[in-house]
Amino acid sequence: MKTVCFGEIMLRLSPPGFERFFQSPALQASFGGGEANVAVSLAHFGCDSHYVTLLPANPIGDAALRTLRAEGVKVDHVLRGGSRLGIYFAESGASQRASTVIYDRAHSAVSELAPGAVNWACVIQGAGWFHWTGITPALGSAVAGCVGEAIEAARAAGAAVSVDLNYRRKLWSEAEAQRVMRPLVQGADLVIANEEDLQAVLGVAVSGADVTRGALDASAYREACATVAHEFDVARVAVTLRESHSASDNHWSGVLFERESGAFHQSPRYALRIVDRIGGGDSFAAGLVFELMGGAPPARALGFAVAASALKHSIPGDFNRVSADEVRRLMDGDGSGRVQR
């Protein structure tokens, strides 16, 4: 089935391995971004995955386009223009040293995208699903207007709409995020959040949850998910739960609430030894979209999403380069890491 994702792909610059910034002269270049990561995952799962963005017409934009094509993503509706591609510097943490991300994305091409620039009726035609994240409207009021246009076109075409709230405090305040995001989220088919997004972006508190303790009670999220579902007319609400014991060791799980039935699903819990956690939430979103779009029972879809994301934590870079079959093998208990011959 055809899927469409809209957002900003960025140039990622990282020190080798677990080095500090400029510990050695080299920085490894790759590409990534919340919605692009979802598009890549969906392509690897076998979807007809389309991505919409604005890339500068220079060699860096060309390289980003080649990367998306190489991962199986359709880029027919990518626009060219703008002055620059956003950059982020990512230092991978280890043990008690946290990972660090520094953004250099002001005045990036996507932030200059104005309403009316994209023919959304053409882009969405034939699609079964449209996905966006809260990062894109945080880049500016003009591109936030583009998100609104895309949502309207998706609904008019009968496509499901999902949003990963993805709050970035380096981009905007909670007050500004809530002012912009609350109307955009209204009526979504699926809202995805992490442990803190519901409060920051929608103003919905999670009572009894303390993300600083390193242990989370999944059941504490049921009431908050139900509040989001009913207040914003959302069919399903999913939350990823990261129990961070150190930068290297996390426990990872998720929950899913269904408004119509009131069912609250909890996934299995995975112990992770982290190689790269960037893109973990995006791989969860892609897994959930893929399974729900294919008609999987919600509990099964949640399990697939968490397993897909668990595998992503073992892969350097933003992209989750795993197949649906690999995810299902992990779901079926093949998590030993033994060589596959």
Predicted segments with their positions:
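Conserved phosphate/ATP/ADP-binding segment of small-molecule kinases
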Residues: 171-260
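Conserved N-terminal subdomain of the carbohydrate kinase-like
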Residues: 48-137, 161, 327-341
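Alpha-helix C-terminal capping segments
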Residues: 30, 38-48, 291-294
